[in-house]
């Protein structure tokens, strides 16, 4: 078995759950691309970000199995698209579909992918039931603003443990002000924040110098944010992670 000699830090949520302080994003990634990363992935823990909408849950599962990376060292993030229920499927059916495609008996983190559908409050209440059954460790949301979080809390009495926020491409000062307000609100409520595409997407990331990327990551780590990296370049991934760990 491969000896994973590199150790990474953790973030603790308000429920006391402990998760790696970065995640591997799989948006637009194929099975082969994920497999190539996992073959040389040198760290002792792996948090892997998936979603029904990415249409690659089965590809992620196959890549993990083929890579030989220990399943007991993996934290899975899954996301339900509230629009899926327009087809008549229940939250439970969609959740069980994710477990089946990922080939796992339960999931570590399960999120609502966005608040665009009017059904997100109903979805949230059903997710609480699944968590109470022991099928989900932590429930969260993705790209929820303050008003949407308040709405699900008012209807359920339960705040998300995690809010994953995609950082806007070509972000204006106003965009980043809005993101910062959400981060501050979440942290005030004890909600952990994940920064997806922390450099604003691949196009913007390629335009940034190493120093600029380092400054961004240090700012995010100073706020205890988890970063979700979607790169398919293992050198870039390891460099970003090393900067995060150095800044701890």
Residue positions per predicted region:
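Short amphipathic alpha-helices and their capping/turn segments at secondary-structure boundaries
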Residues: 10, 61-67, 94-101, 180-185
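Short, acidic/polar
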Residues: 29-41, 86-103, 122, 146-151, ...
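N-terminal binding-site loop/beta-alpha segment at the start of enzyme catalytic domains
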Residues: 1-74, 105, 126, 200-203
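Active-site mouth loops of central-metabolism enzymes
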Residues: 21-32, 79-89, 118
């Amino acid at each position: 078995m491969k000896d994973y000699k590199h150790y990474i830090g953790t973030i603790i949520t308000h429920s006391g759950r402990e998760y790696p302080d970065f995640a591997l994003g799989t948006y637009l990634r194929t099975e082969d691309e994920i497999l190539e990363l996992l073959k040389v992935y040198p760290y002792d823990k792996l948090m892997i970000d998936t979603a029904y909408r990415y249409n690659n849950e089965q590809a992620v599962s196959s890549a993990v199995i083929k890579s030989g990376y220990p399943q007991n060292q993996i934290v899975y993030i899954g996301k339900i698209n509230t629009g899926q229920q327009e087809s008549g499927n229940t939250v439970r059916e969609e959740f069980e579909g994710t477990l089946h495609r990922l080939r796992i008996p339960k999931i570590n983190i399960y999120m609502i992918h966005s608040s665009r559908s009017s059904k997100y409050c109903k979805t949230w209440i059903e997710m609480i039931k699944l968590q109470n059954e022991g099928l989900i460790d932590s429930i969260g949301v993705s790209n929820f603003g303050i008003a949407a979080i308040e709405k699900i809390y008012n209807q359920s009495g339960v705040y998300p443990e995690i809010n994953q926020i995609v950082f806007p491409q070509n972000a204006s000062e106003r965009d980043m002000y809005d993101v910062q307000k959400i981060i501050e609100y979440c942290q005030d409520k004890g909600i952990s924040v994940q920064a997806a595409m922390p450099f604003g997407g691949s196009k913007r990331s390629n335009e940034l110098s190493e120093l600029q990327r380092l400054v961004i990551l240090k700012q995010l780590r100073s706020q205890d944010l988890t970063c979700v990296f979607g790169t398919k370049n293992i050198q870039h991934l390891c460099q970003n992670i090393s900067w995060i760990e150095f800044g701890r």
